[in-house]
Amino acid sequence: MRQADVTRNTSETKIQISINLDGTGKAELASGVPFLDHMLDQIARHGMIDLKVVAQGDTHIDDHHTVEDVGITLGQAFAKAVGDKAGITRYGHSYVPLDETLSRVVVDFSGRPGLEFNVPFTRARVGDFDVDLSIEFFRGFVNHAGVTLHIDNLRGINAHHQIETVFKAFGRALRMALTVDPRAAGVVPSTKGSL
C-alpha cells in the first residue's frame, strides 16, 4: 500500500498528516484554517487520495505558518508514500472549469522541485483567507515532495473560483501522475533508471 504518516513539530506549528494514495477520496481535516480545509478536501476528492490532516498553529498571528507547514508536511508524506516511483505514470495534468474560471495544473514526479505559479488573483482575500498563502502552500509542497508543478489560472473573475479550480486540478493531476501503469510494473519512469 502506498501510504504514509508524517509529523512535523516546530515552535510555530504541530502538523500530523496521513495519506493513502490508493484511497477513495475520504478526508478528515482539522488544520485550524477553514478555507485550507476546503481546499485540502478538493485534493482528496479529486485525487482519490485518503487524507487526514490535524494541525495546530500560531493562527492568532496569521495563517501563514500553518498553511505553509501543511504544504511542507503533505509534500513529505507524498515523497514517502510514492517511494522510488517504480511503475507510476509520473506525469499528470488537468484542466478544471468552475463557471467563468478555468485553471490548468501539470505535475512531474521528477525528483526536482520547481514551481511555476501564474494565478492573477482578482482580490486579496477570500473571506478570511489571504490568497497569497496558496503559493506558500504549493511552494512548501514541491520543495518536499520533489515535484515540478506548473499552475496556471487561464481565466477567472471570482478569486474563490480561481483557488478552487487550482486545487481541484491539482488533485486530478496527482491522480493521473500517481496511477500505476501495469505495463511498467516495477520500472522507474525515466531513461536514467532513477528519479
From Swiss-Prot:
EC number: 4.2.1.19
Primary localization: cytoplasm
InterPro entries: IGPD_sf (IPR038494), ImidazoleglycerolP_deHydtase (IPR000807), ImidazoleglycerP_deHydtase_CS (IPR020565), Ribosomal_Su5_D2-typ_SF (IPR020568)
Catalytic reaction equation(s): D-erythro-1-(imidazol-4-yl)glycerol 3-phosphate = 3-(imidazol-4-yl)-2-oxopropyl phosphate + H2O
Pathway assignment: Amino-acid biosynthesis; L-histidine biosynthesis; L-histidine from 5-phospho-alpha-D-ribose 1-diphosphate: step 6/9
Locations listed in the record: Cytoplasm
Alphabetically ordered keywords of this record: Amino-acid biosynthesis, Cytoplasm, Histidine biosynthesis, Lyase
GO molecular function: imidazoleglycerol-phosphate dehydratase activity
Any single GO CC term annotated in Swiss-Prot or TrEMBL for this entry: cytoplasm
SUPFAM superfamilies hit by this protein: Ribosomal protein S5 domain 2-like
Protein family according to the UniProt entry: Belongs to the imidazoleglycerol-phosphate dehydratase family.
Database matches in NCBIfam families: PRK00951.1-1, PRK00951.1-5, PRK00951.2-1, PRK00951.2-4
HAMAP family: HisB
Protein name (database record): Imidazoleglycerol-phosphate dehydratase
Gene: hisB
